[in-house]
Amino acid sequence: MVPHAILARGRDVCRRNGLLILSVLSVIVGCLLGFFLRTRRLSPQEISYFQFPGELLMRMLKMMILPLVVSSLMSGLASLDAKTSSRLGVLTVAYYLWTTFMAVIVGIFMVSIIHPGSAAQKETTEQSGKPIMSSADALLDLIRNMFPANLVEATFKQYRTKTTPVVKSPKVAPEEAPPRRILIYGVQEENGSHVQNFALDLTPPPEVVYKSEPGTSDGMNVLGIVFFSATMGIMLGRMGDSGAPLVSFCQCLNESVMKIVAVAVWYFPFGIVFLIAGKILEMDDPRAVGKKLGFYSVTVVCGLVLHGLFILPLLYFFITKKNPIVFIRGILQALLIALATSSSSATLPITFKCLLENNHIDRRIARFVLPVGATINMDGTALYEAVAAIFIAQVNNYELDFGQIITISITATAASIGAAGIPQAGLVTMVIVLTSVGLPTDDITLIIAVDWALDRFRTMINVLGDALAAGIMAHICRKDFARDTGTEKLLPCETKPVSLQEIVAAQQNGCVKSVAEASELTLGPTCPHHVPVQVEQDEELPAASLNHCTIQISELETNV
């Protein structure tokens, strides 16, 4: 009996957590397969063919980002009243800013203790000296992207200032131009039979200035779409019945996308194997990279572990008085997808699925908190930017005072908000942090070799922070949403047919006052005043035509 019980228990666990087990195995198999194939010396073309199943996984996830973000924000905010939505919005944004600032402090603390810059060696790379946009342009681009000029273009492009070098010609007369100085010197050979002359031109080079021009870059403008969808959802909620058709459309779109996710999720373990193995095949020599940037990588990973596995769960525990381990276990599938895809936006459909099905978070809260978090809550990115900035300062033997460290903490928090939920977006916003304290932006190339791997770990922390925020907001706002229970227009798949006897019983108990209100009865909690009422069968009415019937309900006559 005991072996049979154990076997039955094992089958039950596999049935309930089969997808999670497959995802864990796919990560392990992908790592082993990638390091094994490195010994085969595959060509770049062969590697691209090998990565094709993983590329399909990324395309499937990105395909669902736009409809999911738009439908969830618009339907979620439209279903809330103005007071509830404003309170939820203020609490969510304040929580995100606070946890992001805490992540920056953790990063500064870890990099100051480990001091990884002393073990790294600075090398001149081919990319040094390339023009990079200033911090002012980067901040202005964030604000511009919040208000896209073309919503259709915002679905596949975002605004980005382009910096081009321009040779500045001196505006002086030819006779006033600086003279051209040439220095000639000779080098005699060892036998003294021949003298080689060399000429050195000492004319000063022309002045080069960088000009900022408007431009675009490929990638969805997630910040602008989130801002527009949130505003549209709030306005639809205030329009009342006139906005109900569009709200119903958004609810149906959101539900259909989640059903697509439920089907596509079974392809993810297969795609993860090739996605991770392909990235390992593209990696440079691991020994050389580890020797140069090993301490830097350890610093970032330790900071992420401290913030993600200790600070955020403790914050969740103290606020909700619930076990964070149980909550995190419910979103393990989303964390594994974040590790594989390195994109918090691409992980958004899976995070929705885990919170609704495993952790039973209110659908209205998840619809608002998750899309906003995937856009502005970047705890892992903020920690990484703070560590990288101080690491570059240590490599250049640049001592940072207390004021500069405070500047780094503030700018890293602000810059991470604008980092779109796409792979390696932190490298772009890193410019803001470096220029704020006068560090050379060319040294970003020092950390590119390991950024692809660290990006996956910080994406996991970003997704974990979004999910825990949804759990905390569900606990804090539970009374507000308890008062609003029944006001949300649910989908047809979320309602049940109501019989005539139930309508009469509800009306006699005083739970509803009209037939129209009685038709809104759903699967929600029953009315506290409800008492089962025995409804007598009405006398058989004479047959009516198929196109007309009369229903009598408590002295109300309704023609249908």
Swiss-Prot record:
Residues with glycosylation annotation: 191
GO BP annotations listed: chloride transmembrane transport; dicarboxylic acid transport; L-glutamate transmembrane transport; monoatomic ion transport; neurotransmitter transport; neurotransmitter uptake
MF annotations from Gene Ontology: extracellularly glutamate-gated chloride channel activity; glutamate:sodium symporter activity; high-affinity L-glutamate transmembrane transporter activity; L-glutamate transmembrane transporter activity; neutral L-amino acid transmembrane transporter activity
Cellular component GO terms, alphabetical: plasma membrane; postsynapse; synaptic membrane
Intervals, Extracellular compartment: 115-216
Any single Pfam family the record assigns to this protein: SDF
Topology in the lipid bilayer: Multi-pass membrane protein
Cytoplasmic topological intervals: 1-16
Catalytic activity: K(+)(in) + L-glutamate(out) + 3 Na(+)(out) + H(+)(out) = K(+)(out) + L-glutamate(in) + 3 Na(+)(in) + H(+)(in); K(+)(in) + L-aspartate(out) + 3 Na(+)(out) + H(+)(out) = K(+)(out) + L-aspartate(in) + 3 Na(+)(in) + H(+)(in); D-aspartate(out) + K(+)(in) + 3 Na(+)(out) + H(+)(out) = D-aspartate(in) + K(+)(out) + 3 Na(+)(in) + H(+)(in)
Alphabetically ordered keywords of this record: Cell membrane, Glycoprotein, Membrane, Symport, Synapse, Transmembrane, Transmembrane helix, Transport
Record carries keyword DNA-binding: no
PANTHER family attached to this UniProt entry: EXCITATORY AMINO ACID TRANSPORTER 5 (PTHR11958:SF22), SODIUM/DICARBOXYLATE SYMPORTER-RELATED (PTHR11958)
Entry function: Sodium-dependent, high-affinity amino acid transporter that mediates the uptake of L-glutamate and also L-aspartate and D-aspartate. Functions as a symporter that transports one amino acid molecule together with two or three Na(+) ions and one proton, in parallel with the counter-transport of one K(+) ion. Acts primarily as an inhibitory glutamate-gated chloride channel being a major inhibitory presynaptic receptor at mammalian rod bipolar cell axon terminals. Glutamate binding gates a large Cl(-) conductance that mediates inhibition, affecting visual processing in the retina.
Subunit composition and interactions: Interacts with the PDZ domains of DLG4.
Protein name (record): Excitatory amino acid transporter 5
Gene behind this protein: SLC1A7
